[in-house]
Amino acid sequence: MKTRLQPVYAAVREASGIVFGFDREDRQKSDNSYTFYLRYVGPLPSSNDVKVDITLREQLVYPLQDRAILRGYEEFNDLPEDRRIQVYSLEEIAAEKTLALADRARNEPRDLYDLWHLTSHEGIELGALAGAMRMKLAFRGKPCVGLADAIRYKEARLRALWLGRLNYQMTALPEFDDVFRAVQRTLRKADLP
C-alpha cells in the first residue's frame, strides 16, 4: 500500500500544495478499511501526523463537492488558500456520523460533536437523510432499526471519553450534556427507524 500511495501524495501536493508521506500503519486491523498515519510538513513543532482511514467498500449517496481549503487557525498559514479539493457533502457526513454513533463497535465522541455541529450550525435535517441511511445500511447488510436507541445506549461511554478525546482539538468544547440533549432532540424530530 505504501508504494501505491506515492502517486496520490504527488497529486495531493499538486492540487493542494500540502506535502504528505507515509508514517506508520495502525495497529488495529479491519476487514473493510485500511488505516494508517501520514506525516505532513507544517509550521507546528508538535506531532505532524494525521490518521487516514480508507474504507474499501462504501456506498456514496450524495455527489462529492468541490470546496476551497479552509484555513481556520493562524498556525496553519502555510495552507494554500487558492486551492480546492473534493470532499463529501455535509449530508453524506451527517448520515455517516449518525450511523457511526449507532454502531456498537464505534465509540468516538467526535462523531457526536460533528453530528451536533452539522445539525445545530450547518442546517442539516436528519429526517431528510433517512433514505440515505437506509441505503447505506442495506449496502452493509445491516438492518435499519433502532438508530436513536443505539445512540442513547452509548451515552455513558461517550460522556467518559468526551473531554479526553476532544478537549485538545478545539478552543471552546461545549458541555457534553448540552450536546447530547440537542442530538437526542434532533433524532426524535427526525423520526429515524
Language-model features: where?
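Structured mid-to-C-terminal alpha-helical surface segments
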Residues: 1-193
